């Protein structure tokens, strides 16, 4: 199983004081050195954390691959074609939200998403759609030509009872298997921590997890190398469980 380390909140800390540090590039290189299989960045329309220059700098510095999260806008499409990341994950975006609140509604935007997917695919960029684990959305993702889906794990991570967490887990598990049966590559992420990652990592249909906020929070106490190492180890051990 692959680990994508999201470095958005390295930029959040930097921007809080308007300084040049901590460096997203340095964070990306440290994460790679200590187990990250890819680096994920979300260039939001309001540029609240990652800036345009960060994306170019990280793309040019890393040895693994860049997964660029972006909204379904012409501006972001143009940026992606300039940066040329290995992967683009199209996500829903609202300016007033603190973080991404739900999955992309592919059903409601099939024509536009299909157009973006074709343009990016023709440019050699693999497209992923960040969606809820809903069979209709998963089928729509396949219909628009996206080869990859990233299942939104936020409801699982935020569940306030064990019963609700189990319900959300089963939804993700079923969605992952359905997507896999359709021939889609399945990733997952949002809200995952060292404490809740194991069940998700046990779903064999899921190939990659993208994790950011909790890793950066852990890094405040453990250091980024150890935070990445522990997450990677937790994912590895989960795969060994019956």
Swiss-Prot record:
Show which residues form the site (Transition state stabilizer). Answer: 150
Q: Which InterPro entries has this protein been placed in?
A: Aldolase_TIM (IPR013785), PyrdxlP_synth_PdxJ (IPR004569), Pyridoxine-5'_phos_synth (IPR036130)
Annotated pathway, please?
Answer: Cofactor biosynthesis; pyridoxine 5'-phosphate biosynthesis; pyridoxine 5'-phosphate from D-erythrose 4-phosphate: step 5/5
* Broadest EC class assigned to this enzyme: transferase
At which positions is 1-deoxy-D-xylulose 5-phosphate bound? 8-9, 44, 49, 99
What biological-process GO terms show up in the record? pyridoxine biosynthetic process
User: Which reaction is this enzyme known to catalyze?
Assistant: 3-amino-2-oxopropyl phosphate + 1-deoxy-D-xylulose 5-phosphate = pyridoxine 5'-phosphate + phosphate + 2 H2O + H(+)
Where's the active site on this chain? 42, 69, 190
Pfam families, per this entry? Answer: PdxJ
Q: Which UniProt keywords apply?
A: Cytoplasm, Pyridoxine biosynthesis, Transferase
Question: GO terms for CC?
Answer: cytosol
Can you say where in the cell this protein is located? Cytoplasm
Q: E.C. number, please? A: 2.6.99.2
Cytoplasm listed as a keyword: yes
User: Main localization of the protein?
Assistant: cytoplasm
Q: What's the domain of life for this entry?
A: Bacteria
List ligand-binding residues for 3-amino-2-oxopropyl phosphate: 6, 17, 191, 212-213
Q: Name one GO molecular function term.
A: pyridoxine 5'-phosphate synthase activity
Q: What HAMAP family does this protein map onto?
A: PdxJ
State what this protein does: Catalyzes the complicated ring closure reaction between the two acyclic compounds 1-deoxy-D-xylulose-5-phosphate (DXP) and 3-amino-2-oxopropyl phosphate (1-amino-acetone-3-phosphate or AAP) to form pyridoxine 5'-phosphate (PNP) and inorganic phosphate.
Could you give the subunit structure recorded for this chain? Homooctamer; tetramer of dimers.
Family according to the record: Belongs to the PNP synthase family.
Identification of the protein by name: Pyridoxine 5'-phosphate synthase
Organism for this UniProt entry: Neisseria meningitidis serogroup B (strain ATCC BAA-335 / MC58)
Q: What is the lineage of its organism?
A: Bacteria, Pseudomonadati, Pseudomonadota, Betaproteobacteria, Neisseriales
The gene from which this protein is expressed is pdxJ
């Amino acid at each position: 199983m692959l680990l994508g380390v999201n470095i958005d909140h390295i930029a959040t800390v930097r921007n809080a004081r308007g300084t040049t540090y901590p460096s997203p590039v340095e964070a990306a290189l440290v994460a790679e050195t200590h187990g990250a299989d890819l680096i994920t960045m979300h260039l939001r329309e309001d540029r609240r954390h990652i800036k345009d220059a960060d994306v170019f700098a990280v793309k040019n510095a890393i040895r693994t691959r860049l997964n660029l999260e972006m909204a379904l806008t012409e501006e972001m499409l143009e940026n992606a074609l300039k940066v040329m990341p290995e992967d683009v994950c199209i996500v829903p975006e609202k300016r007033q939200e603190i973080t991404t609140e739900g999955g992309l509604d592919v059903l409601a935007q099939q024509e536009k998403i299909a157009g973006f997917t074709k343009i990016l695919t023709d440019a050699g960029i693999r497209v992923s759609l960040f969606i809820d684990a809903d069979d209709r959305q998963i089928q729509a993702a396949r219909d628009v030509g996206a080869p990859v889906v990233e299942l939104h794990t936020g409801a699982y991570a935020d569940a306030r009872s064990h019963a609700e967490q189990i319900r959300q887990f089963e939804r993700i598990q079923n969605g992952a298997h359905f997507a896999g049966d359709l021939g889609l590559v399945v990733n997952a992420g949002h809200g995952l921590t060292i404490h809740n990652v194991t069940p998700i990592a046990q779903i064999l249909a899921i190939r990659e997890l993208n994790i950011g906020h909790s890793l950066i929070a852990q890094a405040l106490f453990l250091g980024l190398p150890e935070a990445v190492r522990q997450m990677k180890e937790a994912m590895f051990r989960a795969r060994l469980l019956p």
